Structures are given as structure tokens and as C-alpha cells.
From Swiss-Prot:
Pfam families reported for this sequence: CheB_methylest (PF01339), Response_reg (PF00072)
Protein name: Protein-glutamate methylesterase/protein-glutamine glutaminase
EC number: 3.1.1.61, 3.5.1.44
Gene designation per UniProt: cheB
Entry note about domains: Contains a C-terminal catalytic domain, and an N-terminal region which modulates catalytic activity.
Family: Belongs to the CheB family.
Annotated active site: S164, H191, D288
Region (Disordered): 132-154
Amino acid sequence: MTEALVVDDSHFMRTVISDILEDGGVDVVGTAENGARALDAVTDVQPDVITMDVEMPEMDGIEATAEIMREQPTPILMVSALTTEDADATLEAMEKGAIDTFAKPGGTISTELSGHSEELVAAVERVASADPTAGHDVEMEPASPPDATTSEYADNPTLLIGASTGGPNVVESILASLPAEADFRVLIVQHMPDQFTSRFADRLDAASQYDITEAEDGSRIGGGEGLVARGDYHMRVSGYSNGRLRVRLDQSERLHSVRPAIDVTFKSAAERVTDPLVSVVLTGMGSDGADGVRAVKDAGGATLAQNEATSAVFGIPERAIETGCVDDVLPVDQLTEAIADSIRRTT
């Protein structure tokens, strides 16, 4: 049975979360009202997973996450309100080592959480299975610039990135090291709640030489630009011409129980994009992305996957690899170089 530590400054929320987890078959072995108490509790009860509030007195969730990852790495699920402030703080906590996030419906003191019991239990179990040390503090190998006499980048390439649990840091690392001269159009699908994807796009934009924004219905991008799929919306490539692509957003049925789905974006890109196409699937649980990788491969695109050793959860890459359509499986620090290599051409 999975053993959990529940950390929240609200006694009400500690009780609600604990009851939901216990009813769902998770053993709550301890609770704490702030980050400082959480540090002691982690040592005492050694849980499999921690649910961590963001805003708490004495020591908040960001500080606590950083300390826990330094002293006793443990999978952490950030449980935060759907606010801009909490979204920023949660993404910072994930940068410090938290694995994933669960959005409290209705605010910091959520009376609606019991209506999302199954989702919370599933998130806790998913995070408990993650390797909290995989892929952190990675120094990306920068892509080598093309040799002016022997090679150059192909024209109008498109890069597709799909990720779930443990993905935000990896996506940011790839974007931060992606060479501007490659001039990719970038489409990113990260399983993440609405309200969070806008802030995630802002972080990627700040870290990258590419102009990254959250997708809107009808968004168009060209070289050097990228879109993050909006939370709770599928992102489909609806048109492609002269190196510019257009996307449409919709709230059609969830695929693999998620929206946005990696497969929706990858398959639509494979159908529409007529110039070089590269896909990479990263850490996460489930099979989303496998069909999309197959579609990209069938369309003549390059396909890459993150390896098990650097994946917090290896489900998504593993399912894609099992299709037989993945060209290369690499540690996270080698992915940017491989992405760039896939569009080099000899002159």
C-alpha cells in the first residue's frame, strides 16, 4: 500500500485530503501544517509520496520541496489553488524537484475537492511511482553549430514535444538549449491544468531563445516560435503553408483520459506539416504519444524518446518505444543535440 504524508496549513484541508486518500486505498502515515514540520515528518515516517501545499507559514512548499530533495528525495505532488500566484509558485517548486501538480477546485480552502477524489488518488499513486532524482540538475549538451562547409539546418523544421509527469523541467531544459539558428516551429503538449499552462509558457519563453506563448484558437507560428497547448484543450494543427502553421483548440472528448493529448497534436501535425518534422516524447505515465509517434514516423519524420534512467516515470516513452517507431532513445542531456542533428543536411 502506498504511504503518504499530507502537508497543508489548513486543518480542514489536511483532514479532507487524508480522508480521500484513505478511502482510496492510500495509507496516510503522517500530516504536517507547514514545511518545517514536513521536514521532520519525512525523516520520521519515510513516506512513499508527499502532498504539498504551496502557501504555508514558517516554511512554504517551495522551500520545503528544495530541502526535502536535498536531504531525503521523495516524490512530491504539489496541491495548489488555481490562481496565477499559486501557478507560479507550483512551477518553481517543480523546478526544485516536485514531480507533478494537482489543482484544488474552488480555491485554497477547497470544499469541492471531494468531488475529485478519484483524480487526486490517481495523481498520488502516479507520483508515488516516480523516481524523484531522475532528470534533475542536468546540464544539457548544447547542439553543435552546423559546419559552414559541410552542413546546415534544413528549412522550415517543426519540433513536437510531448510530456506528462515530471516533464516541465525537462521541457524547459530542451527549450533553453535549442539553437535559435535551427529556426524550429515548436509545439509543446505538457499534461497540466488550465491556468498553469499560461505561466508555463511564460517560463519557457524566458528560458529560451524562442518566442513561446500559450496557444489560442487560431494561433499561427513560424520559425523561432512555439506554442504550449492550453490546459483542458486539445491542440490540433489545422493548416500549414510556406513554413507557417496554424492550430485550432477544442474540448472534444478526452483521449487517454487527458486533455490536451499528445496524440492529437502529433497526429494532426503528421497529417498537415509537409516540411521536416521531429517528435520527442518525454517522461510521464500512460500511453499518450505512442500513436502520435507512429504517425510522425509514417509521415517520414524523426522520432526520439527520453530514456528510462532520466525519466521520472517511463510510461510514455516506453509505450512509444514499443511501437518500433522510435529512432533513438537518449538521456535527457543528449536530446537537444539529437533534435538538431535530425534536421542537419550535408551540403
